[in-house]
Amino acid sequence: CALGITESPVAGRRLAGNAALRRNSSLRVFVSGCPNSCAQHQIGDIGLAGSRVRVNGRTTDGYQVYAGADLDDHEIGVVVGRVAAEDLDAAVTAIVGTWEALRHPGESLGRTVRRFTPEGFSLQIQAALADRWAPGPEPAVAPVLVR
């Protein structure tokens, strides 16, 4: 798409080889190249919305990462953090690994995220990724008023 901030097809192909996702083939990962949600990133187990993101003081092309969706519970995902495009594979591995470590038997990723709260789950991911992960959504930038 000409509006894409990131190249979602490239990201999707890279993630197709992710070992953590291969171990958990029932997980649904939806990748949108921008916030317009053509791939409906809010309803994937892991949703990725292409965006300019700030991570560790650097602004770059990357993804706002959604988690917590569970269609059985009528829940959509929320932004749990931000990651640069080059660290996307590591972030998905950390998300899945965190879920594997924290989940109860048979518990979906969405239910695990909600049980820990999105903020608490994000802190677990940050512990794994250190300065390659920024918790929460991209901070809003106040508009500049010109007189």
Please provide the spans of the model-predicted regions:
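Mobile "lid/hinge" segments at catalytic clefts and subdomain interfaces of large enzymes
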Residues: Q42-L102
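Small-residue-enriched alpha-helical segments and adjacent helix-cap loops
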Residues: C1-R58, Y63
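Short, internal active-site loops enriched in acidic
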Residues: P35-S37, F116-E119
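Short secondary-structure junctions and interdomain/linker hinges
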Residues: R22, W99-G106, G120-L123, R132, ...
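Flexible, glycine/charged-enriched surface loops at secondary-structure junctions
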Residues: R23-R28, L102-R114
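Intrinsic disorder at enzyme termini
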Residues: Q124-R147
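Alpha-helix initiation and N-capping motif
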Residues: G12, V92, G106-L109, P118, ...
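Conserved active-site and cofactor/substrate-binding residues in soluble primary-metabolism enzymes
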Residues: T6, V10, V83-A90, E107
